[in-house]
Amino acid sequence: FYARALKAVTDLQAKGYHTFDLKSEIGSRPESLQPLTHLALGKKVIYNAPYNSSYAAQGDVTLTDGIRGDWTYGDGAWQGFISKNRLDVTVDMENETTIHSVTAAFMQVVGAEVFLPASVVISVSDDGVNFTELKHQDFVVNKEEAIKFSDVSWEGTVKGRYVRYQARAGKELGGWIFTDEIIVK
């Protein structure tokens, strides 16, 4: 199909039509094309801070449904957070689980006031109340990067039932935080 489409575009351009340049088309975000399997797949997510109803994606199942987002936050796979605490969720793994990594992807679209997080905290707990911090990292958010995607991960070995992921916006820029999946391996 693609080869035929390129030929059709060339023919149309030769006749003076201004078509979309298919050679510059990058297609879907590769991560969005392949469903994920991971330890948190289908697990309950407890929202310690709510997602925004305008960008609910698939609701409470979004962050553990195995579906990664495409290039735009309105595609139904990215969940948006604008409350004071931004992203603050706990994944109930149902049983004590050996965990080797926890990852979430974030997007930045400066023109829409969507920014990468200024800080991320990843924690684990046996009881859902007392958490042990695995990672706390602060970031400098560069608003000169108009569009950017970034994974923020912890890697190691730990056991726990509850995995908490927190991402905060910076005081300077504020704005939205969008993520598509909490990946636990």
Feature names for model-found ranges:
Residues 69-135, 146-185:
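Aromatic, loop-rich ligand-recognition surfaces of beta-strand-rich domains
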Residues 5, 21-24, 135, 143, ...:
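Prokaryotic Sec-type signal peptides and long signal-anchor helices
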Residues 10, 65-67, 160:
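Intrinsically disordered, low-complexity repeat segments enriched in small/polar residues
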Residues 1-35:
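Catalytic domains of carbohydrate-active enzymes that cleave complex glycans
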Residues 6-11, 17, 52, 59-60, ...:
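Compositionally biased non-globular segments, especially hydrophobic aliphatic-rich helices
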Residues 140-146:
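Short proline/glycine- and polar residue-rich coil/turn motifs
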Residues 50, 127, 139:
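Residues that form or immediately flank small-molecule/cofactor binding pockets and catalytic motifs
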Residues 30-68:
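Predominantly extracellular/luminal regions of secreted and cell-surface proteins
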